[in-house]
């Protein structure tokens, strides 16, 4: 059933004359929704669980938090699962309430795609999601733009999917899942994905989520609260993957590839730049293929704001962005409709200049995605 966004979400006219591009919006792909789009025999697995209540954690192998029964993931909790968007009409209505002009769509369940244990099943689900997304959700006319899911288990198949959808007018990039990922994205195993994305001039976006999983950096079972796990999981995952990509030469091997990261906040980036530069000065013999300091490559990474830090003095966010030279690479993201989404009005309170605010709220995303203000590919 189509729902209307709660009235308290409505913004003022602050963004009335400003383009707002939300680079992290989540659709909800249930097993029943994906089943008709899934190849046999894996369609049977989805059909068998299609009529189960939407409780997430009792869906075997579809989107478990872990692959080892001795670990348990807490995502999503009942609170998180209480807010979903079921149709593009509902999504458009609610994004209008938030003054969002263009929304970049990520999945829900498939945030955890890497933890699936069966390669063929994972690839089939990724292909089904891509078909479902373009059929049911994406619409440049409605300002809803899609990302091609890259199956981490089968990079060759993922490269074929990128080639298949590269010219689709509504598919503007490639989603790289990070939750429970092993090996990290710097591994040469994934080169076919990066080669395809660079060839077709599509940006890639890394997105993580909280899971407890026996691979670095998700082996966070030492924590006993979700507060602790959520504090570290998203950000540590993104940091680890970027370090791996820099030190294995991903950025030098694919110099025209645009890379973005989502749902990790922004305050860690200055530290990572400084720390990597220090280590580089002492251990550059490990990475003779790097022609510049690590910070040179990290400054090219586009970074989505959600979940934005909330210091007592919001001017500190301006200073943080200056430290990583992020005026032209920071992109607004809300994480709508998840319970911890960031309202656009929060950014009206941060003392950015009008020029910087316009860049962060929309202009940087247009350049990253290579689209115009209507969502049309350039």
Predicted segments with their positions:
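Mid-to-C-terminal alpha-helical segments outside catalytic/metal-binding sites
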Residues: 2-21, 32-102, 131, 135, ...
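Aromatic- and glycine-enriched glycan-recognition loops and surfaces
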Residues: 81-89, 125-131, 182-192
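Divalent metal-dependent hydrolysis catalytic cores, especially in the metallo-beta-lactamase
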Residues: 74-81, 92-116, 143-151, 172-176
